[in-house]
Amino acid sequence: MALFARVLINLHLSQPTISGYFCGLILPNMNVLVVGSGGREHALSHKIVQSTQCEKLFIAPGNGGTAALGENVALDIENAAEVAAFVKAHAIDIVVIGPEAPLVAGVHDGLKTFPELEDLVVVGPRQAAAELEGSKDFAKEFMMRHHIPTAAYQTFTKDTLEQGQTFLETLDAPYVLKADGLAAGKGVLIIEDLDEAKEELKNMLVDAKFGDASSRVVIEEFLAGIEFSIFALTDGKGGYALLPEAKDYKRIGEGDTGLNTGGMGAVSPVPFFDAALRERTVREIIEPTIQGLVKDNLPYQGFVFFGLINTTKGPKVIEYNVRMGDPETEVVIPRLETDIIDLFVAMHNGTLDQLSVAVNPQTAATVMAVSGGYPGAYEKGKAIHGLGDFEGTTVYHAGTKPGEVITTSGGRVMAFTSFGADKDEALAKSYAALKEVSFDGMNYRTDIGFDL
């Protein structure tokens, strides 16, 4: 490919106008496939089509919002052979894998088994490195091995259930139980009562509460503090680009109460993440992680999500994710002013340490509209009314289905993202736009950013 010999041109558009899926404005020449269907993938797609280097965009399977940016395509995104056939048939230059499941399933590895795809840019780690998210125990061992600050822990199976229950007795409440494998973001339990924690451990290990994901359970000490996330794009050779931080809001209810969700909103930047905390986070967590991947020979070209908590003893890692977060992507990626394709090409070439990242200094805030009943049972197929262009607000679709009338197709339906001089201004714009949109049962939190 002549892909990497080109002069790369940046064009930063604060209010891009997109017509169909032909998005190259100057020297259009690259075809991009984004894998996934959520708000994260819509936000990534929105940023990609702002690049002067994007000729055609495909999204698999996409949603009602991505259909306006590119061509939605029906693919089994965990089937590497099917994805590879599409890549070859449509001369794809860059594949951006949004969700974790295809990465843990080894889709990146599968694509690279085809000699003609040797130069394909794939954003997302190989299967071995994806275990950082695929296995909590694997991630904890990695952190311990590389002296990365995290909570003390032990891992148990159904054969060591009694030892696990005894270990719980040595801890102070609340008790943190984590299913080892992928559990759609629902595999972490924080329990105040010791007897209830013991019973839940049995439910997870013996009764397979989370299926195979809880065949092993990590029990760890509870860390008190305020959570936040930071993101990096790494090139697999020790180079990385640090992206903006964010704080998301997981609980369904006001004041962070009720059941966990995939995320009800997010804010970036995070006011308490000052220069001193940033320096310590980079020194104690980011760089040891990036270097640890190289030392352990874990092939990793892609986004690293650092789920962190700021404690009285400094920042500690709660979890790694091997892709961007959702809804964090909807506030982090819009702030990015560097051409995102430049970043992906530098990642592929191993030259990220030579590239500076420009970030919009304004605050971005997003609020998620969800289906009635979510995160429990909810109905789909509800017509969405009032969608249009909102001044200062971008609507990123998640659980929507394209058609003559766009309808709901998931629990989290749309993210309303706005910029402002501060979080209050940004949130005011998002909430104003939210009030113009409706569907039967629509719900959202009114207090995003309340603790910042």
Predicted regions: what they are:
Residues 282-304, 321-390, 401:
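Active-site "cap" helix and flanking loop/linker of ATP-utilizing ligase/carboxylase catalytic domains
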Residues 33, 119-120, 132-218, 236, ...:
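Active-site nucleotide/adenylate-binding loops and adjacent lid/helix of ATP-dependent enzymes
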Residues 188-327:
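Internal nucleotide-binding/catalytic subdomain
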Residues 408-452:
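Generic C-terminus detector
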Residues 7, 21, 26-125:
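ATP-binding N-terminal substructure of ATP-dependent carboxylate-amine bond-forming enzymes
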Residues 12-15, 21:
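Low-complexity, intrinsically disordered or signal/transmembrane-proximal segments
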Residues 377-417, 427:
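C-terminal hydrophobic structural anchor segments
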